[in-house]
């Protein structure tokens, strides 16, 4: 397998399936394309690998799969023993719901607090739409951690939902955000710390 990704310091969408693929333990080749190059060179470099013209893209045999969530779903089917989705049906349904909410939502947090793993820690002056996103994240994390007992959103096993929220944890750190200011009951901040201690994330960060 070959996973085509963008700049590790910035590309949240590349990070998510990379973390999931690392958890499976399957061997893969990483093709890194530097983003934000001048003269549209990044797009030109991506296009031969990805029909969508976007990263990430996973090449698995004669398949090329674009989009981070589609890649993660493929990995969950390809490596069922890795438990990328919870075994329990209720936990699996809500973990999927959380991952999809992250996939399609929280646009203000994305725009106001872009991921940059090499940026110094700084406190951001957050507008109300971003605060609303953070309140929802705190609520979602606390609900799932309380319901399934943690330490991960679906229970005992780290999985796709956790991969999808790992970039959020980096944003909290980079921008000096305390989830307790947005309704966190204590579970969310601890969870964010655990995400940033995962060996998969530490390996990604080391390459940034």
Predicted regions: what they are:
Residues 1-127:
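GST-like domain detector, emphasizing the conserved glutathione-binding G-site
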Residues 102, 106-197:
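GST-like fold's C-terminal all-alpha helical module
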Residues 204:
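Exposed, tryptophan/tyrosine-rich binding patches on extracellular proteins
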Residues 207-208:
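Exported/periplasmic ABC-transporter solute-binding proteins
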